[in-house]
């Protein structure tokens, strides 16, 4: 089976779940191609980028300058030479194709692509990518079935939903399969009008063979805490920093590492300085997978206090939590989005309410005193949960079988 991944931007260091699924399909022996609208960050890449030669497998549709007017000029210049093609004219149908017609991105692509991209199935990651893929198929740029994976921001952000809800309803008709990553999102798609027969929950997972289950590590002095996340509001890292302020005031010895990059970096650093926590909180930025693994090995607890952003943006089910649970690192997170579908509070990890720094600090302080037997029981159940329900190899085999039926 030829599988093409349709992405708005590739590669992105924060979207390891996309990278992992691409390499999994390659490992299963499928012919894989990547079609992306824009080139992502090729400077900060994971080892798989080179190992699997993904640059050679990727076709970028646009190489645009920055800035709205510059983009529009670029697209107009690309559109004009292709006006002799019927698809280019068709792409200028504002009524049918909406903003992606008005901003000329569809016509620019149609003008430049002389031969369609052909695959048995196109897997579009995130709802907006599915919307664009369905339009490009109708315009003859893509040829194959389209399955769209819905993750989190694409089905929770108020800004995204205000723009894309009518587009999604078109996608429900044009597309072949909707793949929400959680039961919660499956319910939301149904409530938006997607026919139930076009919905199948397909979770993101982890490759269990990549993780050696470490021996039970009792919390040390200081307590070693770690977060690996894109630095955005919904990750709740500002709540974690506030909890750290309270822990320090209580005399709890700890060290906290926050790994990742993102738009909230300056805000988080300012908060650390404001609370005078520079001696206990470290933000080393982006680290490749092998360095992250070494830092995870040193950690006593993995912290991800996710929240609903002020714009409504929510998590799906964070892969970072799955990875920590798979390797045997205890996790502390929040009752948020699909996280309770992964972490059973008090049994395979610990959950506190969203935006509750006091509850988070209390949970971490209590964790620092946990006994070995209780910790071992939680860690064992956590790994079993991931192995049973979030095993990437099993999930991707099931997905491949499903895709062959559409």
UniProtKB/Swiss-Prot annotation:
It comes from the Bacteria. The gene is wcaL. Keywords: Glycosyltransferase, Lipopolysaccharide biosynthesis, Transferase. The keyword Kinase does not apply. Pathway: Slime biogenesis; slime polysaccharide biosynthesis. It holds the Pfam family Glyco_transf_4. One of its GO terms (molecular function) is glycosyltransferase activity. Its EC number is 2.4.-.-. The keyword Glycosyltransferase applies. Transmembrane segments: none annotated. It comes from Salmonella typhimurium (strain LT2 / SGSC1412 / ATCC 700720). This is Putative colanic acid biosynthesis glycosyltransferase WcaL. Belongs to the glycosyltransferase group 1 family. Glycosyltransferase 4 subfamily. InterPro entries: Colanic_acid_synth_WcaL, Glyco_trans_1, Glyco_trans_4-like_N. GO terms for biological process: lipopolysaccharide biosynthetic process; slime layer polysaccharide biosynthetic process.
């Amino acid at each position: 089976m030829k599988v093409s991944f349709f992405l708005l931007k590739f590669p992105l260091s924060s979207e390891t779940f996309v990278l992992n699924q691409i390499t999994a399909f390659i490992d299963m022996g499928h012919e894989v191609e990547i079609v992306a609208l824009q080139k992502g960050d090729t400077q900060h890449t994971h080892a798989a980028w080179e190992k699997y030669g993904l640059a050679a497998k990727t076709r970028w549709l646009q190489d645009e300058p920055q800035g709205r007017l510059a983009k529009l000029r670029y697209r107009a210049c690309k559109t004009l030479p292709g006006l002799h093609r019927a698809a280019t004219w068709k792409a200028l149908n504002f009524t049918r194709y909406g903003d992606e017609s008005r901003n000329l991105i569809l016509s620019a692509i149609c003008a430049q692509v002389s031969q369609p991209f052909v695959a048995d199935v196109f897997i579009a990651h995130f709802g907006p990518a599915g919307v664009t893929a369905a339009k490009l198929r109708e315009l003859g740029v893509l040829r194959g079935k389209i399955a769209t994976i819905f993750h989190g921001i694409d089905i929770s952000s108020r800004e995204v939903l205000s723009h894309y809800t009518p587009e999604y309803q078109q996608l429900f008709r044009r597309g072949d399969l909707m793949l929400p990553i959680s039961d919660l999102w499956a319910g939301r798609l149904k409530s938006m009008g997607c026919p139930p027969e076009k919905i199948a929950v397909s979770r993101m997972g982890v490759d269990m063979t990549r993780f050696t289950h470490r021996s039970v590590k009792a919390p040390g002095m200081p307590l070693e805490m770690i977060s690996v996340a894109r630095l955005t509001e919904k990750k709740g890292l500002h709540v974690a920093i506030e909890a750290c302020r309270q822990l320090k005031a209580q005399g709890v010895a700890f060290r906290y590492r926050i790994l990742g990059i993102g738009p909230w970096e300056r805000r988080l650093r300012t908060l650390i300085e404001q609370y005078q926590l520079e001696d206990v909180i470290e933000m080393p930025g982006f680290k490749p997978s092998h360095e992250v693994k070494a830092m995870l090995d040193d950690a006593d607890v993995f912290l991800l206090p996710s929240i609903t952003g002020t714009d409504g943006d929510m998590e799906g089910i964070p892969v970072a939590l799955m990875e920590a649970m798979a390797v045997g690192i205890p996790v502390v997170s929040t009752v948020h989005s699909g996280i309770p579908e992964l972490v059973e509070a008090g049994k395979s990890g610990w959950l506190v309410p969203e935006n509750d720094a006091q509850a988070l600090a209390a949970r971490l302080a209590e964790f620092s005193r946990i006994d070995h037997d209780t910790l071992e029981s939680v860690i064992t159940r956590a790994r079993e949960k991931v192995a049973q329900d979030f095993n990437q190899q099993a999930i991707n085999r099931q997905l491949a079988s499903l895709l062959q039926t559409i």
